[in-house]
Amino acid sequence: MATPSMMPQWSYMHISGQDASEYLSPGLVQFARATETYFSLNNKFRNPTVAPTHDVTTDRSQRLTLRFIPVDREDTAYSYKARFTLAVGDNRVLDMASTYFDIRGVLDRGPTFKPYSGTAYNALAPKGAPNSCEWEQTEDSGRAVAEDEEEEDEDEEEEEEEQNARDQATKKTHVYAQAPLSGETITKSGLQIGSDNAETQAKPVYADPSYQPEPQIGESQWNEADANAAGGRVLKKTTPMKPCYGSYARPTNPFGGQSVLVPDEKGVPLPKVDLQFFSNTTSLNDRQGNATKPKVVLYSEDVNMETPDTHLSYKPGKGDENSKAMLGQQSMPNRPNYIAFRDNFIGLMYYNSTGNMGVLAGQASQLNAVVDLQDRNTELSYQLLLDSIGDRTRYFSMWNQAVDSYDPDVRIIENHGTEDELPNYCFPLGGIGVTDTYQAIKANGNGSGDNGDTTWTKDETFATRNEIGVGNNFAMEINLNANLWRNFLYSNIALYLPDKLKYNPTNVEISDNPNTYDYMNKRVVAPGLVDCYINLGARWSLDYMDNVNPFNHHRNAGLRYRSMLLGNGRYVPFHIQVPQKFFAIKNLLLLPGSYTYEWNFRKDVNMVLQSSLGNDLRVDGASIKFDSICLYATFFPMAHNTASTLEAMLRNDTNDQSFNDYLSAANMLYPIPANATNVPISIPSRNWAAFRGWAFTRLKTKETPSLGSGYDPYYTYSGSIPYLDGTFYLNHTFKKVAITFDSSVSWPGNDRLLTPNEFEIKRSVDGEGYNVAQCNMTKDWFLVQMLANYNIGYQGFYIPESYKDRMYSFFRNFQPMSRQVVDDTKYKEYQQVGILHQHNNSGFVGYLAPTMREGQAYPANVPYPLIGKTAVDSITQKKFLCDRTLWRIPFSSNFMSMGALTDLGQNLLYANSAHALDMTFEVDPMDEPTLLYVLFEVFDVVRVHQPHRGVIETVYLRTPFSAGNATT
């Protein structure tokens, strides 16, 4: 095969787009046209469905798909390596574009997997309502109450002393319970719930203590008479107190009973249920003359109490011992955490990693066609390729294609208030509510009664007790719309605020590792930070949320779909199909011969799996195990003579297969320390011929794994990985880009509004009116992005065509916004009131926490009115967001004349031989380390030559970064 140095000089095309993805020789194009009824030489997903109808002599030729079993496996703690021998027979052509790895294994998504919001257990219960329960308390109740109040302030030593004093005192059991089931009578055998009339003498039937009375059965209508005998179940003092919301105890018998089984004398496990009898209080007994008779029986039991999907958001004391104060615990649902394989199985196969790449080698030559380059953008390139050939919003389950997304109403809040003109009422079940008892009377005598001298007497035709309510129906009001909107804001925005704005709930145990689910789940935030009155009437994203990854969210529809594909349980036996993405071999036509094909598959759960919270799945107990990895491959269904003709043509080096990487770029990551604002870059001197431009964005260090190692021990995150999947969201943090070549030529020039050697992205102060679209992006930058993405060099009423305006493009993701805020310099009455002292809806909401409402109804002191006759002085704030896309600066001979030209009309950068490059990026400071991700757009081409059976040779050409690295 000819080496690049022996080949004629390539003629470079300077293009601004990424459309030139594959080049075929004229001979191969002619052949493809002649045989287009048999197969299609398109992109990744060719469709080999038309089998030939003649010249087929063997059964094997009709078998389109074959399964290859690995000849060697290597299963380690961090990876699984599979090696295959591909035998391509005579008159066959194997289509590498159709190959996929068929993988079976077992996935443990860990105890932090929760594929829903809210709770599955008693979701309708109030958050602070206890179960029917019991606790012990000292006989001196006054002292006990005082102890409860002081409990929070005591340290451990005082608690131990207090405990000893309590042990010496007399303890009594207290009960807080409900007895919903009415019975006929109560005896020492319990509650009689019926009679067995089968025998001559009716035999009473008592509740079966193992499961009766059942908690779900009680009075079936609102006006049932008061029960003389009632029963219910109650949890013993030895069962830990938990709020009813979220509490669960597994059944221990087929009837649904939940009592803990205790072995009897013979070792047979039986439910341990004790009957507790209760009468009216003494004063009532004396008044009614009832002596002491049971009115209520409670069936007390211990159960296996669990809270599978909730946790405590408020706890009165540090201890877990049952007490009266513990009745006031508040429960809160665990945060949803979807866990699934990444979009297109990103991260599952090793790419871009030194020493861990795959192998495709002919067994006759053993030359590997896969060349190690640490900055191949294989995963990102594949994402952008798919976007260019199809609609990424349509999911394709076979390849796990469901693109990461976010709810735009969560990223940018359009707070237009709540439509709550009419009040919403709720009424008592009987409609009337509180009634008084009346006696019917009638007029006595024949007088008219107009003078008020009528006498009245009891009306014996009516009952003695008649229930009558006076006035309007009893009702309670709730603002449903405002509550729903407030809950949306808290669940979707407040809980995702940066951790520095959150705090630990009092007395609640919490992990000290901020990467764990336990820590993320239990931290709470004051609802007032994101309430329904914040930025009311504006379309604005919370400034705190702009730099938070919006794709790490339970409303990431793509991740939710991929999670549901696996099911809704923690343990999943999975069976998946994974395509090859490496550009040099994903579209290859493999000619007859025997080949070795080998690849590595990661087992690092943080890389392979994606979670909506981004917690450290390694620490939180997730794991993945591969049981088998097979390879499925498809042969072109061609007649033998057609296949042999194609083989003969492809063996000729003039018909080598050439493939361009879709992204065709060398990437570099430059660290940006926390709070830094300037990032300088230097590129050594080189010839810039064939250079297409720059694309850049910003990544968080925490969210970017080290691809050079198979297992990065410092990678403690499992959310979206912008570096690989294109979920960029920090584009708005760039201010300026300065570009300086070491020549006297200024680039860009001073055309239009462009400042020489500089691109200004946004302006906070815009005295000259350079900004555009009512935000702080400059007109220059808007123009450059429209040119780079759509070749639109002028404005007017012209927006890009839909086929150009794809998911990752600029125009679709550009979101300008503005709002007004109080001008604290002009408005002299302004007071900077801290959140601790702000009140709005006081008395109707919890104080600084998602807990029980407290306070009183009172005029609000926040926010200042920006409308109406009393509107205060205000200033306008402007900004924009532009997620998913890469900022692009084209560098091409047909992209505007952005520099001085020679007499021949040629830019000096092309005329001169080599230049060094200095770039300086000015960015907004962020309080954590980040990375500047720069793609140097080049021509990244591979030529594949198969001169003989079992021989495959490749030449990779990347100009002007020949070795694949921007520093070489």
UniProtKB/Swiss-Prot annotation:
InterPro entries: Adenovirus_Pll_hexon_C, Adenovirus_Pll_hexon_N, Adenovirus_Pll_hexon_sub2, ADV_hexon, VP_dsDNA_II. The keyword Chloroplast does not apply. Residues 125-188 are annotated as: Disordered. The modification Phosphoserine is found at residues 182, 283. Residues 147-162 have a biased composition (Acidic residues). The modification Phosphotyrosine is found at residue 956. It is found in: Virion; Host nucleus. The modification N-acetylalanine is found at residue 2. It holds the Pfam family Adeno_hexon_C. It comes from the Viruses. Induction: Expressed in the late phase of the viral replicative cycle. Disulfide bonds: none annotated. The record marks 793 as: Involved in interaction with pre-protein VI. Its main location: virion. GO terms for molecular function: structural molecule activity. One of its GO terms (biological process) is microtubule-dependent intracellular transport of viral material towards nucleus. Keywords: Acetylation, Capsid protein, Cytoplasmic inwards viral transport, Host nucleus, Host-virus interaction, Late protein, Microtubular inwards viral transport, Phosphoprotein, T=25 icosahedral capsid protein, Virion, Virus entry into host cell. GO terms for cellular component: host cell; host cell nucleus; T=25 icosahedral viral capsid. SUPFAM superfamilies: Group II dsDNA viruses VP. The keyword 4Fe-4S does not apply. Major capsid protein that self-associates to form 240 hexon trimers, each in the shape of a hexagon, building most of the pseudo T=25 capsid. Assembled into trimeric units with the help of the chaperone shutoff protein. Transported by pre-protein VI to the nucleus where it associates with other structural proteins to form an empty capsid. Might be involved, through its interaction with host dyneins, in the intracellular microtubule-dependent transport of incoming viral capsid to the nucleus. All late proteins expressed from the major late promoter are produced by alternative splicing and alternative polyadenylation of the same gene giving rise to non-overlapping ORFs. A leader sequence is present in the N-terminus of all these mRNAs and is recognized by the viral shutoff protein to provide expression although conventional translation via ribosome scanning from the cap has been shut off in the host cell. Homotrimer. Interacts with the capsid vertex protein; this interaction binds the peripentonal hexons to the neighboring penton base. Interacts with the hexon-linking protein; this interaction tethers the hexons surrounding the penton to those situated in the central plate of the facet. Interacts with the hexon-interlacing protein; this interaction lashes the hexons together. Interacts with pre-protein VI; this interaction probably allows nuclear import of hexon trimers and possibly pre-capsid assembly. Belongs to the adenoviridae hexon protein family. This is Hexon protein. It comes from Human adenovirus C serotype 2 (HAdV-2). The gene is L3.
